[in-house]
Amino acid sequence: MNLLPCNPHGNGLLYAGFNQDHGCFACGMENGFRVYNTDPLKEKEKQEFLEGGVGHVEMLFRCNYLALVGGGKKPKYPPNKVMIWDDLKKKTVIEIEFSTEVKAVKLRRDRIVVVLDSMIKVFTFTHNPHQLHVFETCYNPKGLCVLCPNSNNSLLAFPGTHTGHVQLVDLASTEKPPVDIPAHEGVLSCIALNLQGTRIATASEKGTLIRIFDTSSGHLIQELRRGSQAANIYCINFNQDASLICVSSDHGTVHIFAAEDPKRNKQSSLASASFLPKYFSSKWSFSKFQVPSGSPCICAFGTEPNAVIAICADGSYYKFLFNPKGECIRDVYAQFLEMTDDKL
């Protein structure tokens, strides 16, 4: 989540994002970057620069390599460069320069994927990165792109050249035609893959519907309704076995849906009435909670199967627990920016 345009809190937080399995999250700051264990919350790394903001931090699971892009009032690095930071050596070891601003970076053990505003470039993850592929996208200012971290699945998903379409490419066999999914009529605002790379969830800028597709066929599996009013979707994430998804938006609410068992989701008692509009047959979240501050947040499932974590732009950390009935309670609250690495 790039917080640059929407973080009014003055706490120096520019970016927050989870690693591939959501076990850690990283923060880009006006004076460096930080890495935290997600659940339980613990500061793992704090790298401060005397002068220099980091607008994007991408982790590779828990290994010592991170991708950094400069940002903020005084960027540490030019915003058109990707810097690979070796946290053991405490220095950058790879640098890739582009002619335009970098919107996002994705990593897997063998690839560096760089998102520009209308194209995606794929490089080898080597000391001297070699460009392998270039894919055109529609205008993509949010840097939407997801890369499957599974060693047996090299799937890359990104906005297609047509509005609302998602393109799926297998980086291990790019000679195969990509899967093109006409996911929404409007502009995409969020996409997410499950860990296995078999499901993709999408939302448009309208933000009322979440759709889940099979990645091999492109077929729609489920359509879920977040709400009736438009919303800016900040984050969608699957749990470990892809049976649940959580969704955060600018309404200050985190919704939890059943992705595999639609009967768990709520539905109107009028759902079976064929003469009523499609809205009445919608599947709604079976559980939701309000982030008390209403601050922009990203969300993911915790170490317990019934736990959801919210990381907020105001520096708040929330852990909520939900039961099979959908009831939610707040279990943990903390201010993660005020922690030090010797505190829990």
UniProtKB/Swiss-Prot annotation:
GO terms for biological process: autophagosome assembly; autophagy of mitochondrion; cellular response to starvation; glycophagy; nucleophagy; pexophagy; protein localization to phagophore assembly site. A motif (L/FRRG motif) lies at residues 224-227. It is found in: Preautophagosomal structure; Lysosome. One of its GO terms (cellular component) is cytosol. The keyword Oxidoreductase does not apply. SMART domains: WD40. Belongs to the WD repeat PROPPIN family. Interacts with the TSC1-TSC2 complex; stimulated upon starvation. Interacts with RB1CC1. Interacts with ATG2A. This is WD repeat domain phosphoinositide-interacting protein 3. It comes from Homo sapiens (Human). The gene is WDR45B.
